[in-house]
């Protein structure tokens, strides 16, 4: 069985590759020539640099692959941007690259048995902030960030094609060894400070990256899961305060100054951070799109369909996952 995992050099992609190898797949990693392959050192991994920008070249590349190797049995399309200095790039990379890829797979007769799109809870936008009920799959999708909007467009491209079966996963906050966004808060608390945006506690949910990889393969390998979509989370709900204090405990910090700052101040900080990032030509964790995520109070989602259809049971609690992550950060010199 052959599998292609795009975005394989990224945080989530690396764990998807590890899971594929563990399950005995002939594993193809879709990576750019200039990508960091330091986490893709297993000699069994095969590489392909997909030519997303050129529709004809991509089609010919996939046609040539199919003729020589045969189509992949499964494809996990995980490639994408989570932050950028140019918002237009969200739509180009997350949405239009997906459109060209889908078209090329069909035109090149390289259709997989199943195609999995790694999307995001952000494709739904604001959750109910009065009763804080979970976001459900049948709720209207109204993303409020450019990132979320671009992921929704990609989802729609996948849903509209009829060449092969698909499944769409929408993970909530993904954390684990090597993740950089949550690491910002971990590093801040390690330094003795914690800044939380907004005076109303934020309800947040998580999924450990290894559990997400397991869920992805359960969705691919279950023949009954056809043309469906799921939220992926560990099923627990936390407040931002609980998350910060758990980090403090696990880091062994006796004294941390926890400060809640008004949303207007957080917005200013994100805007300034984005401006400085643009001046340096580097994408930054704190940006205007990120502020809209920080502003949202309800990140609770209904993961029951995932458990019912796939029998998915996360192996990691937030505590266990953070313990493993912090150990990795320390072992690799991040902390």
Which positions does each model-derived feature cover?
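Catalytic helix-loop patch of NAD(P)-dependent Rossmann-fold dehydrogenases
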Residues: 128-173, 194-198
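N-terminal Rossmann NAD(P)H-binding glycine-rich loop of SDR-like oxidoreductase domains
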Residues: 3-23
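Conserved Rossmann-fold NAD(P)-dependent oxidoreductase catalytic core, especially the SDR/UDP-sugar
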Residues: 77, 99-146
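Conserved C-terminal active-site "lid" loop/helix of NAD(P)H-dependent oxidoreductases
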Residues: 209, 245, 269-313
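Substrate-positioning beta->alpha
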Residues: 149, 153, 179-184, 198-220, ...
